[in-house]
Amino acid sequence: MTNETIYPLRGELEIPGDKSISHRAIMFGSLAKGITEVTHFLQGADCLSTISCFQKLGIKIENTQEKIIIYGKGLHGLSAPTDILDCGNSGTTTRLISGILSGQSFTSTLTGDASIQKRPMKRIMDPLRQMGADITSVHDNNCAPLMIKGSKLNGIHYHSPIASAQVKSSILLAGLYADGETRVTEPYISRNHSEIMLSHFGANVRTEGTTAILLPNPILEGQKIAVPGDISSAAYFIAAGLLVPGSEILLKNVGINPTRDGILRVAKEMDGNVELLNINTDNGEPTADILVKFSALHGITIGGEIIPTLIDEIPIIAIMAAFAKGTTIIKDAAELKVKESNRIQVMVDNLKAMGADIESTDDGMIIHGGKDLHGAIIDSHMDHRIAMSFAIASLLADGHITILDKNCVDISFPTFYQDLNRLAGNTLHF
C-alpha cells in the first residue's frame, strides 16, 4: 500500500453486517419452524461456511445477496450429512455447530482450514462431554477435525474458566436438546448475541449476573432479522478517523451491544472524539450511527472485564496506541494467542518492523507511542484483523507497506479496501 500524501478520510459508510449475528441467524433460523429472512447479512467467507454446513444438514437456504431466506425445519429437523462439514476459517461455525450436533441422532465430522485445525477445541469438548456428548478429536490433539456422534444430553451448570461467547453458545445450543436446565457461568460477561437472538426466536433463556440460563426443547419460530453493522469491522474506520488529520467519518447503523462496545470506551478514554447518533434497538440489539473526528490520542491501560468486549479489536487498538502519545499497556488478553494467529506476537513483530517501540508480555503488550513509523513488509499470517489493522497503519507510515495475503480480509469485510479508498478520495494504491 502506498499513501504518499496523508489525505483526510471523509464521508459516510455503511459497515457490513455483524459477523457474530449473521452466523447465529443462519443457525437459529435452521433450527426454527418456518421461514426466517435475514437482511444485511455478512457475505464474508466465514458466514458463507455456516450456510454451507447447514445446507449439508438438509436445510434449504437461499442467498439472493439482498437477503437470506432459511426454510427452517424445527429443532429436530436436521438430517445426517453425506459429506464432511467444512467450517473453513470460522471458529464460530466450528464451536457453535458442535453444540448443536451433539444432540442429534446421527454422526457428523467437522473440519476446517489449516488455521482451524490448530485452534483449541478442548474448551468446548470438555463441557459438551460433561453433558453426555460423544465428541472426539480425529487426530487426538484437541483440535479439528472433530467427530460428533449424537447422544442423549443432560443439562449442566458449567463454570467456564474464560469469558468466551463461543464456549457459552456451544453449551447453550447443546442445552436446547438436553434434559434439564443448562447454566453457563463466566468470570466476566462475554458477547450475548446468542441469548438475545435465542430469546427472539422463542427460547426460554435468561441472564443472572454472569450466568446464562436456558431451558430445553423450546419451539423456535422463524423470524425476520435485520443484522446491524459489525462494530469489529467499524473499529478500523473508527481508528482511521481518529488518527488521520482532518478526518470525519459517519459510520451508519452499527451494533453497539454493551458486550461489544469496548472499542468505543477505549477510544473515548484515549481522548478520541467519538459520538453516538440515532441510537435505536432492533431485534433486541442496540444500534447507532458513530461519528468519528480526528483527535490527539494518548496512551492508557486496558485490562480486566473490558477485554471480552474488545478482544477482536486489540490489533487495531495496538495501531492506535502506536500513534498515540505516551504508553499503552494491554493486559489480560492471553486469548489473543489462540485466534486466527498469535495476535500478540504478530502485532509486536509487524509493528517492530515499522519502527514502533513495542514489547510482548505473557498476556498482552506494552506500546510506547509517538514514534515515526516507516514502511515495511507486513506478514498478515492470513489473519483478516491483522491485514486490516496494518492497512490503517499504512495511512500514516512514511514509505510503502506491503501486506502479504492482504485479501484475507474477505473473511469478514470483502469491500474493506474499496471502502477505505473511497473515504480517502480514491488516493490510495493497493
Predicted segments with their positions:
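Structural preference for solvent-exposed beta-strand-turn elements
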Residues: 1-430
